[in-house]
Amino acid sequence: MYLDVKKINKENFSKFGQLISTKNVKSENINTNTTKSFYDLVNVQILGNDNQCRINIFKGKKRQFPLHINMLENHPFSSQAFIPLQKTTFIVVVAPISKIPNLNSIEAFKIPSEEGINFSPKVWHFPL
C-alpha cells in the first residue's frame, strides 16, 4: 500500500490531534518587548492514575523512503507532542482511535518546518 502525503492543516489533522503553529494565533509581546508569547497552542491531555506531565527530547534519525510501515503504536493515557528543535520537515503516519488500528484509514501528513503536532491520547501512529 502506498500513501499520499497530505499537506497538514488544523482541520484535516483534527481527528488525530492538533497542529502546533505560531501562524495566525494570538500573541503578545512580553518582558519589555524582548519576547513574543503565543498562548494556548495545544491541549495537553493526561488520563488515568499517573497525572504527571513529562517533557522529553527525542533525537530521531532521518528515515529512508519509501518508508515501510510495519507497526503502529498509541499512548492510551496521554497526548504526545513533537516539535522540532531544528528547522526541518517531518512526516507522520496516523490512524484514528480504535481498539486495533484500521489499516484502511491510515493517513500521512507532512509537517512543515517550524511547526509541530500533538497526538491525542489513543491515536495510532508510526513511531518517529
Language-model region placement:
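Non-catalytic, conserved peripheral segments adjacent to functional cores
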Residues: M1-A108
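Short beta-strand His + acidic residue motifs that chelate non-heme Fe in jelly-roll/DSBH
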Residues: F82, H125-L128
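Conserved metal-binding segment of the jelly-roll/cupin
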Residues: I111-W124
